[in-house]
Each structure stands twice: as structure tokens, then as C-alpha cells.
């Protein structure tokens, strides 16, 4: 069977990459942050955010989809109970990648990927409401001008 040519690979085969990302996601949800290389962190971020989105839904099908990737039941339980509740107000951007000094042995670019646990600032919510109100007011003015 030929190996897929689409996109860069972190490991020797696509199956190995899937397993490696699943293990890294398990460690991320278990510990809250992990130190790894920058390319691995960049490949892990979309997977972790997708799994958190499934956990926020909270239904049985979402739990089963997460269990396909994360095989540890205690980590899945933590994801659905604790992490999903922390991320309830957040609409995305559940993880943060911070670059750190290169790894000592081989000078590989290292990074820390962590879950963002800070609450969403209320200022952003107020700004979004104000922008929405401005758009509604502009549309109303256009309809009134067209009616006259």
C-alpha cells in the first residue's frame, strides 16, 4: 500500500503519526501542558481543539468519537467533565503554543503547548455586542432610507 504524499509527516508512516498525536493529546489533557518540538505542537493543536469541541457537545456520539483517539477512559472523563466546563464560554482557541529555547541535544525548536484555562475577558464580549448593535443600526437606517 503506498504511503500518502499529501502534507508533511512527523513520523515514518501515517499510522505512526496518528498514534503519536493520540498519545500527545492524552498527555496534554492529563497534565494540562506538555513540552515537545514545535512541529509536533503545531500538528497537535487542531486535533486537541477538535476533541475539546466534541467534549463541549457532551453527547454519547461525541464521547465515542473522542474514545477513538484517546483510549484512556479516565482522561476522557476528565476531558468531558472538567476541561469542557472550563472551556464552556470560549468559542475556540483552547490551546496555546509558547516557543522556548531549542532542545539541548539536537537544537530542535522546542515549544510548550498548554490548555488555556483563563476565563474569557468580558471586554471582548461587550465589544462583540457593540459591533453587532452597530451593524443592526446601520441596516435599519438603510431600510428606512430605501423606504422613503
Swiss-Prot record:
One Pfam family this sequence matches: Ribosomal_L17
Biological processes annotated in GO: translation
First and last residue of the signal peptide: none
Keywords, alphabetical: Ribonucleoprotein, Ribosomal protein
Top-rank taxon: Bacteria
InterPro entries documented for this protein: Ribosomal_bL17, Ribosomal_bL17_CS, Ribosomal_bL17_sf
One term under GO cellular component: cytosolic large ribosomal subunit
MF terms in GO: structural constituent of ribosome
Subunit and partners: Part of the 50S ribosomal subunit. Contacts protein L32.
NCBIfam families: L17 (TIGR00059)
Family named by the database record: Belongs to the bacterial ribosomal protein bL17 family.
Protein's name in the database: Large ribosomal subunit protein bL17
Gene of this entry: rplQ
